[in-house]
Amino acid sequence: MLKDIHQHRILILDFGSQYAQLIARRVREIGVYCELMPCDIDEETIRDFNPHGIILSGGPETVTLSHTLRAPAFIFEIGCPVLGICYGMQTMAYQLGGKVNRTAKAEFGHAQLRVLNPAFLFDGIEDQVSPQGEPLLDVWMSHGDIVSELPPGFEATACTDNSPLAAMADFKRRFFGLQFHPEVTHTPQGHRILAHFVIHICQCIPNWTTKHIIEDSIRDIQEKVGKEQVIVGLSGGVDSAVTATLVHKAIGDQLVCVLVDTGLLRLNEVDEVLNVFQKHLGAKVICVDAKDRFMKALKGISDPEEKRKIAGEQFIRVFEEQAKKLNVKWLGQGTIYPDVIESAKTKTGKGHIIKTHHNVGGLPLNMELKLIEPLRELFKDEVRKLGLELGLPADLIYRHPFPGPGLAIRILGEVSAEYINILKQADAIFIEELKKSDYYHQVSQAFAVFMPLKSVGVKGDARHYGYIIALRAVKTVDFMTAQWADLPHEFLSKVSHRIVNEIKEVSRVVYDMTNKPPATIEWE
């Protein structure tokens, strides 16, 4: 019997926290479906979602100012358990009659939490025990405000040296507040605390498992598509691979895979993709040579958003042409949940569009194909788990992500055949050396970027003006935040040496040492 994987659900209201998506991932890891929505979402949407529990995220603002964000008041009146984290705890306390003040000593980083009442959230959880027998927890703090007076009905359930009210609870109404961040890895017991809220307090059944997600996706595809054919674009990345595999598992020969050779793929990627999918998927694969078409469309275009939208437009037009030849009505896309989040606009401005994702905002409004997106609810790590469960090779599953517009957005400014050729070679050298040195799987994504600027250098006995190549490598779990990879200097020196010696047009190589945020992972 198929499980309803969406039956039990948690709603996360986002107050602009850098950790909001991480909260969602943690809830998914517990085995329960959740969605992330802006904190000012309307009442009808929340009631339609019908959550079993609500989590209020942290945020960068202060509750002490009258114009800052508040939780929708009605969520405290519908009988639903609520967990406030950091800012979420503070706004809950303030809105329910407590007091919040600026603290004389802000807490940023590690703190030791002393549990005063372990009921519900902290039951059976401890890192250490105090001499008085009280449970102690290592937690991660990041706040400049504190709850200075509890709302009616609440009691203090934990404290730190600097925060007498580091956790609070109204057990009767099932409202809980945590001043620390249970979602980050720096709070070792955070996963168990969240599980207590989601499973024990909200009474959610953990049906959100890889096996159940696959079963649900297959059923959904079959119900939507019926006997019609689906066309799926292959890129060599894990998202399109898992999408194609899921669709193939659901409808078999009704799937037609199309690989568009845009001229913007990585070195030798077309041959590699064809080999992998024809060998492992067993589906029909059509390769379309669209290099001239893409170059013509991108000629004279420097704006990154325009390049993304043009790439999306051209992809869809190629697919539509193939679909007409084959009488296909459906387009399968590898859109994943972070694509949806980053491309969403919210009334608060807390979810401003950072960049248009090729799989979301790049689609033309007059698209003739119906869209099916089986991965739309999933984070990248969930997609990888699905791929392994579906039997795709690990080398493909753990291949670094590659953007839909390809090298067009790794070339700053206008794209040209010369720039593409230079970038392909530089990128191939970087990836080859990462694999040879066993660093490839230690980083989450790595690539080269072409800068159409010339820098003076010396080759032989002559001055040489050549282009600049930037190398980018990051480590991340969910691609919502990322840290630049601290690769050994000897390794970077070797890569740089190869690039400037093997690619005559390049005179300088630089390494990008910027985290996300403030930067995005891609340069454009």
From Swiss-Prot:
Database matches in PROSITE patterns: GATASE_TYPE_1 (PS51273), GMPS_ATP_PPASE (PS51553)
EC number: 6.3.5.2
Active site residues of this protein: C86, H181, E183
GO molecular function, one term: ATP binding
InterPro entries: Class_I_gatase-like, GATASE, GMP_synth_C, GMP_synth_GATase, GMP_synthase, GMPS_ATP_PPase_dom, NAD/GMP_synthase, Rossmann-like_a/b/a_fold
Main EC class the enzyme belongs to: ligase
Binding, ATP: S235, G236, G237, V238, D239, S240, A241
The keyword Repressor appears for this protein: no
Keyword Magnesium assigned: no
GO CC entries: cytosol
Residues covered by the GMPS ATP-PPase domain: 208-399
Quaternary context: Homodimer.
Physiological role: Catalyzes the synthesis of GMP from XMP.
Record's protein name: GMP synthase [glutamine-hydrolyzing]
